[in-house]
Amino acid sequence: VFPQVVVTDGFMRRVEQGAAWTLVDPYEVKQVLGIDLPNLWGTEFDEAYEQIEEAVGLGELTLAQTVNARNLFVDILETQVETGLPYIAFKDAINRANPNKHIGIIPSVNLCCESFSVVVPGKLAHSCNLASVNLAQVEDDELPEMCHLAVRLLDNTIDVTTAPIEEARNHNRNLRTIGVGVLGLADYLAKRGLRYQDKRKIRELFKEFSYQCLMGSVLLAKERGSYPAINSSEYGMGNILGKSRSQRSEWKALYDLFDFYGIRNSHVMAIAPNTSSSLIQGCTASVLPPYAKFNAESLGKGDVMKAVPFLREYGDNYQENQRLEQRIVVDAIAEMQKWVDTGISMELVFNLNPDVYAPNKTVDASDIYDTALRAWRRGLKAIYYIRTVKEDRLSEVDGCGDSC
């Protein structure tokens, strides 16, 4: 079992303020007040929660406890640091980007925190249809072809695969959710002498990646038709990634086709961890910096030596996650997230050894708290694992790998 905690902006604002938060039983809330709390987000959730807190004050709800929101969030982070779990999902950021609000909400994320869409109990169950473009082996002028090919491959996969339950089959048929991701970003940056601090370059790369994946889905709609549930969706109202044509004039060619043909897939991009598949493809995993340029990883009966793929040619250009301030990682992922319609599997690595990030500097609990808060403020949708390094050893609890 890999639990996750789903939090709203309302809760996170109280975390910032150090204000009180009332814990309640959603079942009792529904029975007494008729409020289906798990299916609310944003303003509706905030208004409902005020009503719930009033009911608690009047004694109408008996299963309730008031705690300090900041202390509760710190407890969650402490548990995640110690065990690797629970994952943290930011419900409002996820649902603001949901193109299918007319059908329902996105209640949670998948096991690796990157793939999710509308779930309707008894009717629709999310399924992961994922593939990744290897940026370590793709030149910039090849990116459009690779993105279009990945979209086509995944759309074909929906038609040739039979999901194990009817709810998932309905989801595939009506929403045609896919997730094109990338791996080897650290290699891509190292080969070009770029850093994770180069936010403009990262923004430009993922804007192009997003454009080409969306174009691939629009071209498939021209060939095969839009996804069946497009009417009344964000796409049905003429918006791409929540923006209208007038708000994104530089994408004129895409909107010209989209306005006429629609889009084939209701979700198009999702960036998975790719921990195992990156080993097979000879690149770094996903979009994160490598833990180290060269290190031993314990697998089964012994240690396996790992090195970054281009150690000889570009070794000096690689940044090691074990020595990189995690606010830099959060800011880089935030630039990518602007252009990725679903999620990005982001883990945080905090080195607890002294003098790693700066002379006389040692990471403490406040640094981890500030980084998690920064992730929410920058609009990230989830935090996967939080890992810690002590005496050059990485403590971790592994789960998903490439199974999701």
Say what each PLM segment does.
Residues 1-140, 163, 167, 213, ...:
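Active-site cavity-forming subdomains of large catalytic enzyme subunits
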Residues 1-16, 199-205, 212, 288-303:
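Catalytic or ion-translocation cores adjacent to nucleophile or general acid/base/metal-coordination motifs
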Residues 27-28, 147-169, 194-274, 344-345:
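Internal maturation/activation junctions in enzymes
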Residues 15-19, 53, 76-81, 134-137, ...:
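Structural signal for hydrophobic packing residues in well-ordered secondary-structure cores
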Residues 27-35, 90-102, 167-179, 203-207, ...:
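A glycine-rich phosphate-binding loop feature that marks nucleotide/adenosyl-phosphate handling sites
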Residues 116, 154, 158-159, 244, ...:
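Catalytic alpha/beta core of large soluble enzyme barrels
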Residues 80-172, 177, 182-192, 283-285, ...:
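Function-dense linear segments that define catalytic or interfacial modules
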Residues 2, 63-67, 77, 100-103, ...:
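Alpha-helix capping and helix-loop boundary segments enriched in small/acidic/polar residues
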